[in-house]
Amino acid sequence: MKITLTIVGYLLSALLMFAQKSGAYPAQDKLDFRYSPPEWQTAICLPDDPHKSLVDRSGELLYHYGQGGREFGTRISVRVKDAAVWVKQELHSPRVPIVRTYRRAEGLEITEEAFANTAIQPVKTPGAIVKRTDDGGILRNWAKPAATLDPSLRDIVVHMGGDIEYEVAVPKGSSRRIALALCEGYWNEAGKRIQVLSVEGTEKKTVDLVAEIGQNKAAAFWFDGRDTNSDGRISVQVDAAPNGSDKNTILSGLWVFALETKPDSEALLSGKLTSLSLADLHQAISDGPVRSDIILVSVKNTAAGERTFQPTLIVNTTLPLTFQPDQQRALIDNHEVVTASLKMKALKGEIETQRYIELESIKVPAGQTVRFFVQYYNGAASQAGSLNGPPNVGQALQCRERAVEFWEKKSKLPFDRVQLPDPGIQALMESSVRNIWQAREIKNGLPAFQVGPTCYRGLWIVDGAFLLESAAMLGAGDQARNGVAYELTVQKPDGRIESLTNDFWKENGIVLWTCVRHAQLTQDKVWLESVWPKLQLIAEYIKTLRRQTLLNNSPLDDGLNPAGTLDGGIGGTHDEYTNTLWNLTGLKSFIQAAHWLGKTDEAAKWQKEYDNFMLAFQKAVKRDMLKDLGGNTYLPALMGEDGTKQLPQRAQWAFCQAVYPGQIFSKEDALVAGMMAMLEATEREGMVYGTGWDATGIWNYFASFYAHAWLWQGNGFKAAQSLYAFGNHASPTLVWREEQSLKGANFRKVGDMPHNWASAEFIRLTIHLLALDRGNDLHLFEGLPTEWTHAGMITRLNGIATPFGALTMELKIAADGRSASLHVEPLSDPSCKNIIVHLDGWTKTSGEKVMKLDPRKDNEVKIPIR
């Protein structure tokens, strides 16, 4: 067995081992956000809202993600006093995303409350010929076409990871000549962005933008579209082709002409035909609802005398901005509107993209508070006057109260499925639920769960597996099903699942597991039978992958999976283990499902394949096992010599998931023991360090992968510690960034925020610490934190979905703290043999570590504690 590390790995590991021996991190027994990132952003949008409005740590409203060559193309804020100092930021409550930012200046206390106006209604726009129906955005000055071409070709509409969709209104059954333009401003090599252009009633056109057009060169494509289904609309769509590596779609121009207009691409691209068009891209409206967001500012005078101040509205945007004092508004990109309750007096300054609009001065008597607000509309400027936004401060206050009422009483989110005695963990649970529904959208009339509001605004196969599981656990399995069905839409004719890249082989195993777990949690064998032929094809493709390894030039992958993409810390294509681990997991889940459906012969057939697959894996493990500097044995994520060049902990996400939910190892497996010891040796701030994309940072929700592995191995105490460490890396507004730096280090961030795979993992881990299915038994309290067992505390699960039906149970600690009463309602599925209550670590027991309950009975038991 080799003992090897790179020089950097050696130094890092030595430092980490010393830190651990020196007691580098405190016990994680309370939630206090001690490792919160130094910057964050919080969603204030509504559930299923296509308008993903965010607020950052400073209180700025954030819009137009990715536009103008920066993270957010537009930022809107208010300055009351130049010398005001930021104090803190918090939410109205975990359920109510009103973000409160507190500042202090000499003699002044300033509170800014940012929230979405929940009462605003969509405004109908009659007569619009072109309507955009996807949820993508716009990027300005993205390409650099020739100066002789129409300047509008510099801009694109874009959909990150999705399709661009438009509708052209026509008399039913009629036709129009439609021109589309493309101009690639980013890639300079072929094969990157390949798009499929579709116009209803015509043949599709596939275009490799660089190979066929060139970088920063424009081309036009003409289609004679027809309303084939007589619904009064011609659909226009731009899809990413399967063989292109960049799945972000773009469109530089769209024009609608009468059929008699002669196609002339040169004239079109130079702008000479625009005046002849019936409509074009820039006249299109969005199909999304009109929204408004409010910053309500309260200024309290704590001084002895009257104070006068003059606020400033700051609009920082890369988009065109027009200040219209006669109409008392600022206009962004000719259609978005910013207004204020105070008079907008003058544009008093401009620094690059920042414009400073002077508002009228306000006098504040001693000891009194005055309020004003600014408001952002995402709707058309011509409609702003008809929107039912607040015209005065009194109505703005009413808007705030309506927002509170909406989130607390009308949002219908599954907040009440889990009740915990730790208010901090409860707060993160409720915020996680809310954020998952805020990131979600309605697409084609169905709910689509998404990872985040910005760079991860979409559903990926692996992220989606756990997002959809968490939704089903909370009783929203019917809503999650659309996401599960979506994962099957990327299946190819040969059975493979292909979404992220064409060698991300693990997507096959992930989809198998996702479908089986979803069917179990929703207790729906009929649905599982309906998709079974698709799952059979996936299993066959995993078998095909294994055969390919015996025919290629690499001896490292024999009997496993061909070289593929890892993700989660290591980029590129390699001989590696993450694909193998997940495809073993998927096959095991598929076999379990076959037994569940009574397909015993099929289960036996695939068990032989699985056993052979596992033998090949175990053989490779013996070849590639290494030791870290602490003597812990581990399997690197990369095979062969490449594995010696990475930090031991790098990209070990799939290993943890193979432990649980994969369950492909026995509890006694020496590989698991060594791997968990290796990962534990890297801990900083209670978290595994350097496993993600940032080798010197923390992948926040890896804490759940890690904790679930400990829990499955029987160490519930360690899993509970990880829950608190996970929570302490959230921001004070109860959200996570995907990855962040250690406290005090130069801050680097990776990924989206709020990141809702993190939200899903916090939900999954919290519930599984309390209730976890193992085979035909349901185990309770394997990871119950001892902090939740003090006098008077109540822990309750209310209708949580399990493979045995909905679980409702309550653990109530007596007022004197000496005993607990446990109530567990009957489970509906007869396949559950036992409910096993774990007593070790939190009860006064005489050698008994578990208690068995009958799952078919309504159980009421009293448990001595102290």
Kindly label every feature range from the protein language model.
Residues 91-104, 414-453, 659, 673-676:
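Conserved oxyanion/phosphate-binding beta-strand-loop segments in alpha/beta enzyme cores
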Residues 19-133, 151-152, 161, 189, ...:
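Terminal accessory carbohydrate-recognition/targeting modules of carbohydrate-active enzymes
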Residues 6-17:
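Bacterial N-terminal signal peptides
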Residues 288, 292, 353-396, 494-506, ...:
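The feature captures the catalytic groove of carbohydrate-active enzymes
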Residues 123-281:
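Compositionally biased, intrinsically disordered or flexible polar/acidic segments
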Residues 457-494, 533-536, 540, 585-592, ...:
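Active-site core of glycosidic bond-cleaving carbohydrate-active enzymes
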Residues 335, 412-437, 461, 504-506, ...:
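Active-site acid/base region of carbohydrate-active enzymes
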Residues 446-459, 497-500:
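Internal amphipathic alpha-helical repeat/solenoid segments
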